[in-house]
Amino acid sequence: MTHIDLLPQDDSTNGWNNMLPPRNPNPPLTDTVSPDWVVVGAGFAGLAAARRLAENRPQDQIILLEAQNLAGAASGRNAGFAIDLPHGQQLQDELSVMPRHIRLARSAIDYLQQQIDTHSIECQWSSRGQYHGAVSAHAFRTEIEPFARVLDQLGEPYRLLDRPQLAAEIGTSYSPGALYAPGAFLMNPAALVRGLGDSQPENVTIYENSPVITANYGGKITLTTPNGRVRAQQLILGTGIYTEEFGFYKRSLLPIALSA
């Protein structure tokens, strides 16, 4: 039996969540249930897995366990944008693989757009694009201009802005210049996670405030929470950095927290 000792804790600092109206969470698990599938973690990964399972296997029952309230963890407190272009480490890849990155990112954005439209999810979803600003003239030459050349090779639209142009558009003259790409979307991620959770198919049952405290991977998957138990044939973990607690990827995951 695997004991899960490190559990998510809500520090009540999620501004995205705090600006939303109060929501009545789903009740915690207080019984023994035996679904076909159990999904742990109601972030983007767990919510997407539960939804697709339910759509592809409408005869199956799916339980989704969330340790906190919906949108309390990482998926509900990110920077609030969905990017369609290669960025960061992806820019070190071969040019030939970048169209694949773009297709994957845009298919994910299209899927989110479909869910938002279908279920009338109010999350301030908007097509605003993204500004890639430089902190210095040197950074503009070494980061922004090479990025622009990559986009030229990919045939992707963009605009380069100098300091006055950037100040006129976004109100700051801090950066000497920036690159604007039109394909990114902005949203309130906590509202998006709430909406994706509250619009799950009928054969998905979400239990909030139901952290898994033990896991047994015998003939059947058996998970216990403080007040209940799940026995299931199949298990999907959408647990992010907590996956090590479930006995997987030991000494392979490095938690990182960013703020701006």
Give names to the regions the model predicted:
Residues 54-77:
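Glycine-rich FAD pyrophosphate-binding loop
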Residues 41-47, 67:
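Glycine-rich Rossmann-fold phosphate-binding loop(s) that bind the pyrophosphate
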